[in-house]
């Protein structure tokens, strides 16, 4: 995990520039998320520089957005202009919150890059209310086009920490096998296929 954090610390300053190429796809994702978080207490894991939280905060009641990278959170705080949005450094595997604390948990583009993502899902299950919603968009690299495979190859050379290489179907099956009912899914065409998933607990 230390190497994982070091990669994001090194790349925090250029992260937003890297993501600009997928701006239109992210706008579609924000549109999907806003009605789900409307007037809700939200927890975002792996927020990075806070792109998603900043774009949906007007809809939410409050967002606690966290990341394991100190430098990513420093970038996020620099651009934060909302009193409803709070950024902090946290470990998604050991969250300092009581059980059933949040209406919505967002974990975007993170489950494929952490070891043992099922443990992250178990911790999300713990802090999410029984009638809450998990929003888990994830790049599903096994469905890459040829150009996507080339990009992924060079990202790997640069140290990008890819741990799980799913197709969209494999990813949704992984969620179902780990205690979640997928109530909505959409594959968005970004630099890599982005599988947007909204989930509810199957066991409460």
How should these model regions be labeled?
Residues 93-104:
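A short acidic, Gly/Pro-enriched loop at the edge of an enzyme's catalytic core
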Residues 1-37, 51, 55, 75, ...:
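Conserved class I S-adenosyl-L-methionine
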Residues 197-204:
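C-terminal lobe and adjacent flexible extensions of AdoMet/dcAdoMet transferase-like proteins
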Residues 118-130:
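A short glycine-rich, Lys/Arg-flanked "PGG" loop and its adjoining helix->strand segment in the class I
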Residues 2, 18, 22, 135-178, ...:
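C-terminal alpha-helical "lid/dimerization" subdomain adjacent to the S-adenosyl-L-methionine
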Residues 104-116:
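A short SAM/SAH-binding and catalytic strip from SAM-dependent methyltransferases
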Residues 40, 61, 103:
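Conserved acidic residues
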Residues 43, 47-94:
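Class I SAM-dependent methyltransferase SAM/SAH-binding core
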